Amino acid sequence: MTDPTSAGPDQWRFDDLHALYVNCTLKRSPERSHTQGLIDRSRSIMERHGVAVAELRAVDHDIATGVWPDMTEHGWPSDAWPAIYRQVLAADILVLCGPIWLGDNSSVTKRVIERLYACSSVLNEAGQYAYYGRVAGCLLTGNEDGVKHCAMNVLYSLQHLGYTIPPQADAGWIGEAGPGPSYLDPGSGGPQNDFTNRNTTFMTWNLLHLARMLKDAGGIPAYGNQRSEWDAGCRFDFANPEYR
């Protein structure tokens, strides 16, 4: 058996994996996004190992507000989400990325999570929720405080929807308290910060490893977690106290 502590990157293949980074910056393209700087660090690791990486800046798309899969069926004149959702389902790895404002996630981040939730009732071929068998993480940038709070919110939301979260699946950078330079600004120290660089690297590799494991295993085993079977009356050994 291979000792995992001595294995190198050539020990695994990732060239059949797909990753999607969603940048939830408030800035439309082509305005510079500090979050993009952190995305580029993580993305370069994945691409170096053959992962097919897609990326989108959510604010560039006409994503309607709501909690239905297609909001044009609920009064909105247009909705870019159905097309984005197809990209989400095509990805083995999802990384939600965004800025911190007032110690919290951006409004764009919250909208993307709401729309992911809008599709959470969709089932896969095994009768599980559609996000099963996929992994997720998050990257955050900002000033002063809020990285752990924001990561907690994002990662909880994603696991609740069905994503599998690996160890240390978040990374971020924040500046000193008070007004000051952001991640990509000259003199910020962000790109040189060892703590941020380490966590970004660990997050990226843990996403790769867990995505590899799930893909090789055919996803999460389909027993005890199938909504279609539960609705049909199967209770998977759940003891009904009324019959005791």
Residue map of PLM features:
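Short, glycine-/small-residue-rich phosphate/pyrophosphate-handling segment
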Residues: 33, 125-179, 195-198
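A short small-residue
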Residues: 20-23, 175-190
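Short alpha-helix boundary/capping motifs
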Residues: 74, 164, 182-187, 235
